[in-house]
């Protein structure tokens, strides 16, 4: 009996060693223009094409287990509510960078899913938790944070959209940030760009921002314009187009102009931020080779 038990254990170990194991990070994309749900997944395939593994929504505590197999329509992974009832299903296709396909719950609408092969070094960032204190530095540090949405999470970097309630009760506002999850600090994408290449793209972005800003002003009454001038707006000077934050989402880079008229912070609610978005493919020429941004967005 003991000899049989040892044989079974040895056989199981040999089978396990033949399994192919991959780790992925990526996202569910419920709305192609909205926030993502960041995911981390471990997927194991044995020699017969059967899969086991687990995933986590990186901002929630639960680990979800699944099993699956290769089928005609791709890799099908199922999360079971019990022995016979499917709670969730992934239908995935392999690509050069990882996996993509559809996630579908038992009830409700499904979501597109994109998963990239990742490295064990990033496992320490599997659970995403951003310290709100690093988002309270500088402008708006007294305002409360009502929500944080994720635009992209990959390779130890999170691009986020932060909803803020103004301390003075005026219109809520939104800020964008890129966070180094390993060092738990904010980073500026402009530090990782080729200056002359970025300057060329920024000319187009500035031109768009100026045009939109002028159109905004046409909607204001004289008394509102007077208030804005009292708050530091000076149309005789160049617009403050250098006051811009860059942030990535799934497929694009966005220029976010926070305060093109250079008004005092207490009056910024009077003007709406302006955005200019270009595809990442067009922005690649601006990225410094070998930088973290190159590894994040280009894969080199």
Where are these regions (language model features)?
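Sec-dependent N-terminal signal peptides
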Residues: 2-12
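Compositionally biased intrinsically disordered regions enriched in Thr/Gly
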Residues: 22-300
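Sec/Tat signal peptide C-region and signal peptidase I cleavage site
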Residues: 14-19
């Amino acid at each position: 009996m003991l000899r049989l038990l040892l044989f079974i254990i040895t056989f199981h170990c040999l089978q396990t060693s033949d399994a192919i194991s991959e780790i992925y990070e990526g996202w569910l994309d419920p709305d192609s223009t909205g926030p993502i749900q960041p995911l981390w997944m471990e997927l194991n395939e044995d020699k017969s094409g059967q899969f086991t593994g687990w995933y986590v929504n990186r901002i929630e505590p639960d680990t979800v287990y699944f099993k699956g197999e290769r089928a005609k329509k791709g890799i099908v992974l199922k999360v079971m509510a019990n022995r016979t009832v499917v709670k969730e299903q992934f239908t995935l296709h392999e690509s050069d960078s990882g996996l993509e396909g559809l996630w579908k719950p038992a009830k409700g609408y499904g979501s597109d899913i994109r998963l990239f092969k990742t490295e064990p070094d990033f496992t320490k960032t599997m659970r995403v938790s951003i310290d709100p204190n690093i988002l309270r530095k500088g402008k708006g540090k007294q305002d409360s944070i009502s929500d944080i949405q994720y635009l992209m999470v990959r390779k130890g970097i999170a691009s986020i959209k932060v909803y803020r309630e103004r301390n003075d009760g005026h219109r809520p506002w939104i800020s964008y940030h890129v966070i180094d999850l390993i060092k738990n600090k904010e980073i500026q994408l402009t530090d990782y760009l080729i200056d002359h290449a970025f300057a060329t793209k920024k000319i187009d972005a500035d031109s768009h921002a100026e045009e939109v800003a002028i159109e905004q002003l046409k909607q204001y009454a004289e008394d509102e314009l007077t208030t804005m001038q009292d708050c530091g707006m000076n149309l005789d000077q160049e617009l403050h187009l250098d006051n811009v934050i860059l942030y990535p989402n799934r497929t694009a880079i966005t220029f976010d102009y926070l305060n093109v008229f250079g008004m005092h912070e207490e009056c910024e609610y009077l003007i709406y931020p302006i955005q200019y978005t270009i595809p990442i493919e067009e922005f690649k020429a601006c990225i410094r080779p070998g930088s973290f941004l190159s590894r994040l967005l280009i894969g080199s």
